[in-house]
């Protein structure tokens, strides 16, 4: 599976002139093969096998979905530079966050800083939990001022620590299948 399109605003949003909010690890080249999220997916696969028993037919679909997700995570965020005038493409050996760090952007992690949490706790209890409430998807009203879902307390705290004004609003309905639907 080759991932061609991604709603970038679920993983990355510019929140000020030189500040970006992003999901940790995913958009950084140094984690392309060792992203902690890949390890969590391995654990999910192991737990799934244990729950389903030894019958390979029972977990074949699960294995292929997990492998596809892992490959997609490895492929997300690589930067291609296009030359002005010619349109010639050059694939860089960098992901989006790497390029922005070289340009002195402040990178603000969804879920806030890891602190003393283990990597697994940080991902499960903060990053993925708040990502479920669209923590990476804030709306910039103007540079340095964003609207964010109030449920994402760690992300909001990280934004404020970085000097971004946050206008929170209740969006608890997101937990129910990610928002209102017309059926």
Spans of features found by a protein language model:
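The feature marks the mature, well-folded catalytic cores of soluble enzymes
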Residues: 1-183
């Amino acid at each position: 599976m080759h991932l061609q399109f991604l709603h970038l605003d679920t993983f990355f949003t510019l929140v000020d002139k030189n500040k970006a909010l992003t999901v940790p690890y995913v958009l950084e080249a140094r984690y392309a093969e060792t992203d902690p999220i890949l390890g969590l997916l391995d654990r999910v696969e192991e737990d799934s096998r244990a729950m389903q028993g030894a019958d390979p037919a029972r977990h074949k679909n699960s294995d292929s979905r997990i492998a596809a997700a892992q490959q997609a995570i490895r492929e997300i965020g690589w930067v291609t530079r296009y030359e002005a005038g010619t349109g010639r493409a050059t694939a860089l050996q960098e992901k989006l966050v790497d390029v922005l760090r070289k340009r002195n952007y402040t990178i603000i992690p969804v879920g806030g800083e890891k602190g003393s949490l283990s990597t697994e706790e940080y991902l499960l209890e903060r990053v993925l939990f708040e990502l479920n409430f669209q923590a990476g998807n804030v709306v910039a009203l103007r540079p340095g001022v964003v609207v964010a879902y109030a449920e994402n307390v760690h992300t909001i705290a990280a934004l404020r620590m970085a000097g971004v004004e946050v206008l929170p609003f209740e969006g608890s309905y997101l937990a129910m299948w990610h928002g209102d639907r017309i059926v």
